[in-house]
Swiss-Prot record:
Lineage summary: Viruses, Riboviria, Orthornavirae, Negarnaviricota, Haploviricotina
Gene: H
Major location (coarse): virion
GO cellular component: host cell membrane; membrane; viral envelope; virion membrane
Species of provenance: Rinderpest virus (strain Kabete O)
Name recorded for this polypeptide: Hemagglutinin glycoprotein
Residue intervals annotated with topology Virion surface: 59-609
Length: 609
C-alpha cells in the first residue's frame, strides 16, 4: 500500500486545475479575523433592524394620520346625513305634503271650478232664445252717468268673482274659529293655566325683508275671516354699489295681503298672495287699512293734519288710495282719491294708524276730526271734566287740537270699492265720548252685525283704552260701552276715558292698540311693553266682559331697550288665541333701532273641576 504522500500527489496529478495549488491554513490569522467578521455581520444586522423599525414607525404614523382623517370624514358624513335627514323629515316631508295637497286635491278642484266658471260664462254670453238679457245690462248698456271702461268692465267683474271663489275654496280647510276664544267653561271656578307658543314661520314679503336685515318700520297688520293684510315702510340697502364703502338706502311703502294657512307645523302661517311696493313719497307716510270681501283697501296721506274747506275739500291734499285683491287681478288699483265733505262744519282731519272694515263693497274707517261747533256742543262737557281734578288731556300739548283748545269729534270715512265707483272719500261726523289722544282708532264688526265696535288704545300710564259702539243707520251715533266715566254735570252725553291714579307703573313703558275678538261676548286684547323682569317682555292682557274675567301672558323678548312702537293683531286659531306683534325698540346696547316680529299662541286651561 502506497504511503499517504503518494496518494496526495496522485490526486493533484489527475486534477489539472489544482495541480500547482496549495492551501496553507494560518491558524493564528483565522483566530484574529473570525471575530471581526462576526462583529461586521452583527452591525449590518443591527442597521437593518433599525431601518426596519424606522420604516415601520413611518408607516404606523401615516396609518394613524389616515385613520384620523377617515374618522373626521366619517363624522362629517354623519353630520351631513343627519342634516339631510332633518331636512327631509322636518322640511321636505311637510313641503311634499303641501305640494301633494295642492297638486292632488286643490288644483284639480280649482281647475274644475274654473272650467265650470268658463262654461257658465260661455252659456251666459251665448244664451238660449228664451234667456233674459236683463242680467247683462251693465255689460251691454252701462248707465251714462257712470264713467267706466266699457271694454274692461265685464272682464274685471269676472276676475273679481273668480278671486272670491278661489279665496273661499282656499279657506275651506282652515281652522278659523268664530266662537269664544279663551276656551273656558262658564262654571270654571278653579285656577287657570296660561301657556304660550311662539312662531316666526311665515311666507310673507316682510319675513324675507326681515331675514335680509332690512329696516322695517311703521307696520300695522289686520286680520279677518282667514285673511290678513299689512303695510309697512322698508329701507333696502344698495346691492349694486361700485365701492363697498358706499352704502345708501332706498325706502319703500309696501302693501301685502294673503291668507292664513295651516301647513302642518302646528301654527298659523301668513301666506302672502298679492302685494304692492311703491317708492316712499310724502303722501305715503301714514296709512290706514281695511280688510274684507277678499280684498285689502288702504288710504294714505302725508303725516300732518288735513285742513278741510267746504266746497273745495282736498284741493291741497293728496290722498293715495290702494285696493288689492287677495289674488292679483286687473281690478287692483293705485290712484289718488278726492275728499268730499257733506258737512260744512268740518274743518280738520287727523289720521294716524287706523284699522277699518269692508262691508257691502265699501271701506269704512273712524278717525278724529274737528268741527267749528265744538265749543257749542261739547264746551260744557269739557269744562266739567277739567274742573276738580283735571286729567292730563286738559292741559295737553302733545296733540295739536288739544293744545289749541279744540274738542275733537268722531269722523267716519267711507270709500266705495266698486269698479264703476270713482275714488272719492266721503266724510260724516258726530260728537261722542271725549277723545283725549291721537294714538289711533280701530273699527270691528260686532258678532250680530248690527253695530260696530270702535276702540281707542290705552294711553301709557295715564288712561285706559275705550270700547264704544258706532251705528251708521239711520244716522251716525257713537255711544260709550265700557271703560268710560260719565260726567254727570256735563250733560246727558258727556263721557271721558278712565284715567289712572298719579302713581304710575314705571315698569310699563308702552301700550299697544286694543283688539276686539270675534265672539258672542265682548272680549278684547291689549299688550304692554314691560321691563319688570330680567328679560323685557310683551305682556298680553285678555279681557272677557261677559264672564268678568281677565288673563295675561308675558312673552319674553330676545331684545332690550326703550320701546318705540308696539302693534298687535289677534285672531282665533285651532282652540288658541294667536296674536301677531310688531315691536320696535332702541337697543340699550348698540343704540340702534331693532324690531321683533312674530305670532304668539295663547291657550288658557281651566284647572277646576
Amino acid at each position: 500500500m502506497s504511503p499517504p504522500r503518494d496518494r496526495v500527489d496522485a490526486y493533484y496529478k489527475d486534477n489539472f486545475q489544482f495541480k500547482n495549488t496549495r492551501v496553507v491554513l494560518n491558524k493564528e490569522q483565522l483566530l484574529i479575523e473570525r471575530p471581526c467578521m462576526l462583529l461586521t455581520v452583527l452591525f449590518v444586522m443591527f442597521l437593518s433592524l433599525v431601518g426596519l423599525l424606522a420604516i415601520a414607525g413611518i408607516r404606523l404614523h401615516r396609518a394613524a394620520v389616515n385613520t384620523a382623517k377617515i374618522n373626521n370624514d366619517l363624522t362629517t358624513s354623519i353630520d351631513i346625513t343627519k342634516s339631510i335627514e332633518y331636512q327631509v323629515k322636518d322640511v321636505l316631508t311637510p313641503l311634499f305634503k303641501i305640494i301633494g295637497d295642492e297638486v292632488g286635491l286643490r288644483t284639480p278642484q280649482r281647475f274644475t271650478d274654473l272650467t265650470k266658471f268658463i262654461s257658465d260664462k260661455i252659456k251666459f254670453l251665448n244664451p238660449d232664445k228664451e234667456y233674459d238679457f236683463r242680467d247683462i245690462n251693465w255689460c251691454i248698456n252701462p248707465p251714462e252717468r257712470i264713467k267706466i271702461d266699457y271694454d274692461q268692465y265685464c272682464a274685471h267683474t269676472a276676475a273679481e268673482d273668480l278671486i272670491t271663489m278661489l279665496v273661499n275654496s282656499s279657506l275651506t280647510g282652515t281652522t278659523v274659529l268664530r266662537t269664544s276664544l279663551v276656551n273656558l267653561r262658564r262654571n270654571c271656578t278653579g285656577p287657570t293655566t296660561t301657556k304660550g307658543q311662539f312662531s316666526n314661520i311665515s311666507l310673507t314679503l316682510s319675513g324675507i325683508y326681515s331675514g335680509r336685515g332690512y329696516n322695517i318700520s311703521s307696520m300695522i297688520t289686520i286680520t279677518g275671516k282667514g285673511m290678513y293684510g299689512s303695510t309697512y315702510l322698508v329701507g333696502k340697502y344698495n346691492q349694486r354699489a361700485r365701492r363697498p364703502s358706499i352704502v345708501w338706502q332706498q325706502d319703500y311703502r309696501v302693501f301685502e295681503v294673503g291668507i292664513i294657512r295651516e301647513l302642518g307645523v302646528g301654527t298659523p302661517v301668513f301666506h302672502m298672495t298679492n302685494y304692492l311696493e311703491l317708492p316712499r313719497q310724502p303722501e305715503l307716510e301714514t296709512c290706514m287699512l281695511a280688510l274684507g270681501e277678499s280684498k285689502l283697501a288702504a288710504l294714505c296721506l302725508a303725516d300732518s293734519p288735513v285742513a278741510l274747506h267746504y266746497g273745495r275739500v282736498g284741493d291741497d291734499n293728496k290722498i293715495r288710495f290702494v285696493k288689492l285683491g287677495v289674488w292679483a287681478s286687473p281690478a287692483d288699483r293705485d290712484t289718488l282719491a278726492t275728499l268730499s265733505a257733506i258737512d260744512p262744519t268740518l274743518d280738520g282731519l287727523y289720521i294716524t294708524t287706523h284699522r277699518g272694515i269692508i262691508a257691502a263693497g265699501t271701506a269704512i274707517w273712524a278717525v278724529p276730526v274737528t268741527r267749528t261747533d265744538d265749543q257749542v256742543k261739547m264746551g260744557k262737557c269739557r269744562l266739567e271734566a277739567c274742573r276738580d281734578r283735571p286729567p292730563p288731556f286738559c292741559n295737553s300739548t302733545d296733540w295739536e287740537p288739544l293744545e289749541a283748545g279744540r274738542i275733537p269729534a268722531y269722523g267716519v270715512l267711507t270709500i266705495k270699492l266698486g269698479l264703476a265707483d270713482e275714488p272719492k272719500v266721503d266724510i260724516i261726523s258726530e260728537f261722542g265720548p271725549l277723545i283725549t289722544h291721537d294714538s289711533g282708532m280701530d273699527l270691528y264688526t260686532s258678532f250680530d252685525g248690527t253695530k260696530y265696535w270702535l276702540t281707542t288704545p290705552p294711553l301709557q300710564n295715564s288712561a285706559l283704552g275705550t270700547v264704544n259702539t258706532l251705528v251708521l243707520e239711520p244716522s251716525l251715533k257713537i255711544s260709550p260701552n265700557i271703560l268710560t266715566l260719565p260726567i254727570r254735570s256735563g250733560g246727558g252725553d258727556c263721557y271721558t276715558p278712565t284715567y289712572l291714579s298719579d302713581r304710575a307703573d314705571d315698569d310699563v313703558k308702552l301700550s299697544s292698540n286694543l283688539v276686539i275678538l270675534p265672539s258672542r261676548d265682548l272680549q278684547y286684547v291689549s299688550a304692554t311693553y314691560d321691563i319688570s323682569r330680567v328679560e323685557h317682555a310683551i305682556v298680553y292682557h285678555i279681557y272677557s266682559t261677559g264672564r268678568l274675567s281677565s288673563y295675561y301672558y308675558p312673552f319674553k323678548l330676545p331684545i332690550k331697550g326703550d320701546p318705540v312702537s308696539l302693534q298687535i293683531e289677534c285672531f282665533p286659531w285651532d282652540r288658541k288665541l294667536w296674536c301677531h306683534h310688531f315691536c320696535s325698540v332702541i337697543d340699550s346696547g348698540t343704540g340702534e333701532q331693532v324690531t321683533h316680529i312674530g305670532v304668539v299662541g295663547i291657550k288658557i286651561t281651566c284647572n277646576g273641576k
